[in-house]
Structures are given as structure tokens and as C-alpha cells.
Amino acid sequence: MRGALGGVEVVTSLRPVAEDDQADIQRWAGFAAGHMSRTHPLDADADRHAPASGLYWYVIVADGRDVGTVWVELPPGASEAVLGVFLCDASHLGRGLGTAAIELALAEFRADHPGLPVALRVRRANERAIACYRRAGFTVTGSGTKSLPSGETVPYYSMVLAPC
């Protein structure tokens, strides 16, 4: 997928996460921890892309460089999928990479699971992410607060992308 921001074209693609990507993902999670609570799929044992078990997990590649991760997962028995995405450092923000990655991951997921809504939670203070999700078609459907292990309480929005 090609996109442009500020006149600079960026080629964005996805590749399935493999077990040997975990060290990079852990390092990237350190950057993302300041603006999101969850940097991995819900299945704590997951370490790779596994569509047969409902996990579509990808490394985001921009201009040939690994720059983040995106996942769509369908927990067993769930009536909606869950989306997560993050980029590895601030230099990649605001370039359209997140929106492109979400669209690519959703296309793969929906080829196997048409007609399911996709949900996420995003910190209310994360305006850049909220704008990204809105560009991808998500709408705010509710709000709440989450208590972090540190004791901090973080307000969030629930967002949903309706089925196609």
C-alpha cells in the first residue's frame, strides 16, 4: 500500500510475525508503553501469526524497514474481533503508517471472517491514535477507565468498526 504525507511517499506492507521477531517487539513496546497499556495480543502465549487460531499478527514494514506491529484477534467464542497497533518510535508517527497497516490487517482478517465487528480501546489522551482509528473507519461507542498495575487510572474510549 502506498501513501504520502508531506509529499513523501511511503510504501507500507505487512509480514506475519514470527517467533524470532519477539525481541524487537519487546524493544518497541518500551516506546509504546507511554501511550498504551497493551502491546501484545490478548493470548499471552502467542508468539507468532496464527490465523487458524484467530490471530492475525503482523510486523509493519515501511520502505523496507520493520517499524511496528498490528494485530487483529478473534478470541474463542467472541462475537467481535480486537485490534491492536503500535509503531516503534516517534519518527514513524503522523506518516499514515498506522492507518495503512490497519487497513491491510483488516483486509486479511475479513477475508476469513466477513461480517464481524472489530473493537479496540484507546486512551482518551492519545489524540493521534484516535484520529488514526477514525480514518480507518472506527467510531467511538463508549468510554471508561482502566486501572494500571502502577495504580494509575487511565480514561479510555471504546471504538468499533462495523462489519462490512
Set out the residue ranges of the language-model regions.
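Short acidic N-proximal helix/loop "leader" segments that mark the beginning
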Residues: 1-8
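A short beta-loop-alpha structural element at the N-terminal edge
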Residues: 11-25
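Conserved beta-strand core positions
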Residues: 12, 81-83, 118
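Acetyl-CoA-dependent GNAT
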Residues: 16-20, 30-93, 99-108, 112, ...
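Residues within well-ordered alpha-helical secondary structure of globular protein domains
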Residues: 27-31, 135
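Conserved N-terminal glycine/acidic-rich loop preference
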Residues: 71, 77, 83, 101-102, ...
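A generic structural micro-feature
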Residues: 77, 96, 151-155
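C-terminal "cap" of GNAT-fold acetyltransferases
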Residues: 115-119, 123-130, 135, 143-164
